[in-house]
Amino acid sequence: EMNVVKQHPLVGAAMTQRFPEGVTTEKLNQYSYEICRHHHERYDGSGYPDGLKGNEIPICAQVVGIVDAYDALINDRPYKRKYEPEEAIRMISNGECGAFSKKLIQCLTAAAKQKNWLQRQN
């Protein structure tokens, strides 16, 4: 089952290469492809489908990847309960959801505080 799930980045990326001409821009097509294909890559190379690591992972895919992990944590799923935002940020920071760029973790934490998703620490 997990092997089937791990195919979705490849399927999504292939779909972005079949957009009708004139519907989108070349740059948007590139970003769409990179996000679809690489949003499950992890900074330490442990992700999929290509095992990219660090800055080999396009920044747009890194951003979507960390936000996707956060969203998965704070929402109920059939296989797990949802976590509070503070716990989700802690889990991401501690690498419990795979490795992310320290800079992106700082950005996510700052955004969460700014939007009052987290309790502000004085």
Model-derived regions, located:
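Histidine- and acidic-residue-rich, metal-dependent catalytic cores
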Residues: 1-122
